[in-house]
Design a protein with these regions (language model features):
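Enzyme catalytic cores with a strong preference for nitrogen-chemistry domains
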Residues: 1-143
Length: 143
């Protein structure tokens, strides 16, 4: 399996520079300056999720992108998972070490062509029970 870890570029910068990547999975970490408003996405004022889906379709692979949300005063750290042009779901961080973000409610394992992906968002990576739970739920690997 080929995994492309994009560590310095945002999704739009990466896509403009490369036009995509020959990989089974493209992973963008959580950048503090990437914030998505679900309200604006639903109104069509922004297109972050659409861009994630389009990149996954153009590359024929799974794309996982971290981002922050700010909707009606509720701030979360999240990740969106897309495959072949379709959004598979959104995972929110369950943990907040400094209390500056709200926490999500559940963990999810995504069935993809790249395998069963468990998503640990932001500070969740510091809590072994999150990783153990994703493994117990059948993840082939955890991002």
């Amino acid at each position: 399996m080929k995994i492309c870890f994009v560590t310095k570029e945002r999704l739009s910068e990466f896509w403009e520079r490369t036009g995509g990547e020959d990989a089974d999975l493209i992973f963008f970490p959580l950048f503090d300056d990437v914030t998505v408003s679900y309200e604006r996405e639903l109104k069509g004022e922004t297109a972050y999720f659409e861009d994630v889906a389009l990149l996954s379709k153009a590359c024929g692979c799974t794309v996982v992108c971290g981002y922050n949300t700010s909707t009606r005063g509720i701030v979360r750290s999240s990740a969106v998972v897309a495959e072949n042009g379709r959004i598979l779901g959104v995972s929110d961080a369950l943990s907040s070490i400094d209390g500056t973000r709200n926490c999500g409610a559940f963990l999810k394992v995504y069935e993809t062509g790249a395998g069963r992906i468990g998503v640990a968002v932001a500070e969740d990576a510091y809590f072994p029970e999150v990783l153990r739970t994703l493994a117990a739920c059948g993840s082939d690997f955890v991002l």
